[in-house]
Amino acid sequence: MRGFRTIRTGGLAGFILAITMLLRAGLLDAEEIKPAADAPKPLSPRESLERFQLAKGLKIELVASEPLIADPTGIAWDEQGRLFVCEIHGYNLEGHLDIIELNKTGKLDKKIRRIYATPETLAEARKQTYGRVKLLHDTDGDGRMDRADTWADDLPACFGIVPARGGIIVITAFRIIYLNDSTGDGKADIRETLFDGFEMHIIERAINNPRWGQDNWIYVAGANRGASVTGPALKGKVNLGRNDFRFKADGSAIEPVTGTNYTFGLSLTDSGDRFLISTGSHALYAIPLPYRYLARNPHVPTPG
């Protein structure tokens, strides 16, 4: 081969010489694996907008994008016409930290590292993962948000918000929290835990997507995480099982409702019908029977 010279030797001396040459060439060094230089680049907000395929008669416009917001998980307009956005910072951080440590060894690993992350990286990811709520402003009236104020920070990972009681209720990984700005300085100085005790193992499998119902309850997707929750206004623990659930905005009540396992997203019609989507299927599910009827029949299997 061009660039190589044949070396004739034998025995142990030849083996040692061959290994030495390989080491000098860097072929056996455990060097850190570098990211691919030709990895696809993310689309710009404008390019992403052009990729949407809309049904006839529908229109879509860009209202806010990076760097104004980052990793948004929910939006809500309140009664004053203000737009709030909640964010989650640290999604799949355990996998990222695990990959960093793995790359230092120079070994190639084809496992899905988020699933096989070590207890150490999981613990470190929990420390660094947090949620945030921003208040967006359109200062020039062009329909595009051009200013973002941090309204509430240092929250657990946030998975949805809904306006209530003059403020915002945010759905986080472990608890449901009411936030409000009582002084008008643009910061939420009131932070009240309504319900606590929700579980989260993998970060995307947490309670999410709160929606007001016509019955003045707030409905939440349960995401297949069992929970026995407490709250300052509750008389005792409430077992939600692995169901979707609904709660009162003042924290006075919370109860399970009919819902599929692994629910990530829901919507309610004007007549009160609830539709779900699950990670296990592309289909939308309708919920025709109330939980109280299904739960009282021991011969009917129901989620949760």
Indicate where each model-derived feature is located:
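N-terminal secretory signal peptides that target proteins for export/translocation
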Residues: 1-9
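Bacterial N-terminal signal peptides
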Residues: 10-26
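Beta-propeller blade termini and top-face loops
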Residues: 26-304
